[in-house]
Amino acid sequence: MEFPFDVDALFPERITVLDQHLRPPARRPGTTTPARVDLQQQIMTIIDELGKASAKAQHLPAPITSASRMQSNRHVMYILKDTSARPAGKGAIVGFLKVGYKKLFVLDDREAHNEVEPLCILDFYIHESLQRHGHGRELFQHMLQKERVEPHQLAIDRPSQKLLKFLNKHYNLETTVPQVNNFVIFEGFFAHQHPPARKLPPKRAEGDIKPYSSSDREFLKVAVEPPWPLNRAPRRATPPAHPPPRSSSLGNSPERGPLRPFVPEQELLRSLRLCPPHPTARLLLATDPGGSPAQRRRTR
Ligand SMILES: CC(=O)SCCNC(=O)CCNC(=O)[C@H](O)C(C)(C)COP(=O)(O)OP(=O)(O)OC[C@H]1O[C@@H](n2cnc3c(N)ncnc32)[C@H](O)[C@@H]1OP(=O)(O)O
């Protein structure tokens, strides 16, 4: 992937690691140094283009990786440059891997909920012309070493078939532990929780708790939709004009339909007993004059 500026000078190392600050790496001695703001603009251009290419490769309706999303999240991007081909002496980018810690509720093999904060594979892309040349493995290995994690300790955000094959081939990851969210975890995930699953800080104030295992890809569906099960259609006296969304089963992501009115209170409370609380639900209960504190406690 080529750019109209000198990628080779911008990223002196074969693999560059970027965090939310998008700081330009130190340049090689003797290279002219453009203004810092220009360098950061170049980095933002690279990230945006990589995000678009990755989305296209995965048939996503919109990129899940962009410079602005990097700046507003605590994700880490590993970017691999091509050190062999140097078109017009400006270098090229081979691909990237994006990771980040996320608080998730995952099921173990006894189907019990566990609150964990593992390192997650969020986005991964190698340029089409260079796939199956070992570049993906090189990036992945580098990330594992830097982050000090073992492959079975990772959670993967809705992996593609190619990524599942990749993980199987290079890391023998095959048997998954079925989940009800979009993350895939493999056998062995629960065997070693320290590290990488970060020790969680003391219980946060209720308002701070994030939605149920929110995937980075959620916003691709309906941006303002509340999470499952709050998005289920209310019971209706007359049949709906359209068939209801497919029901979910263990191991599959719940199918999300378009934004619907909230479920009736009793059904909502029943659903909430089955899953961790969500701020939207708390807001509903807090504004409901009939919702007693006892009812509210049941949602914890
Ligand atoms: C959470 C997420 O990010 S999900 C999205 C993952 N990204 C994508 O699907 C985008 C398109 N794919 C890619 O960019 C790349 O194929 C990656 C990132 C998945 C792997 O990078 P590569 O450089 O191709 O991997 P690398 O060369 O190190 O390993 C090759 C192995 O990956 C798997 N793989 C890679 N491409 C394919 C493919 N087209 N079909 C099937 N398996 C594939 C295979 O196991 C392959 O081994 P094989 O060639 O012996 O069958």
Swiss-Prot record:
Quaternary state and interactors: Component of the BBSome complex. Interacts with AP2 alpha-adaptins, including AP2A2, but not with AP1 gamma-adaptin (AP1G1/AP1G2); this interaction is required for efficient alpha-tubulin acetylation, hence clathrin-coated pits are sites of microtubule acetylation.
Modified residues annotated as Asymmetric dimethylarginine in this record: R282
Catalytic activity: L-lysyl-[alpha-tubulin] + acetyl-CoA = N(6)-acetyl-L-lysyl-[alpha-tubulin] + CoA + H(+)
Chain's role: Specifically acetylates 'Lys-40' in alpha-tubulin on the lumenal side of microtubules. Promotes microtubule destabilization and accelerates microtubule dynamics; this activity may be independent of acetylation activity. Acetylates alpha-tubulin with a slow enzymatic rate, due to a catalytic site that is not optimized for acetyl transfer. Enters the microtubule through each end and diffuses quickly throughout the lumen of microtubules.
Residue list for modification N6-acetyllysine: K56, K146, K210, K221
Modified residues (Phosphoserine): S249, S253, S292
Annotated protein name in UniProt: Alpha-tubulin N-acetyltransferase 1
Domain N-acetyltransferase span(s) in chain numbering: 1-190
Annotated positions for site Crucial for catalytic activity: Q58
Gene Ontology biological process terms from the UniProt entry: alpha-tubulin acetylation; microtubule cytoskeleton organization; neuron development; regulation of microtubule cytoskeleton organization
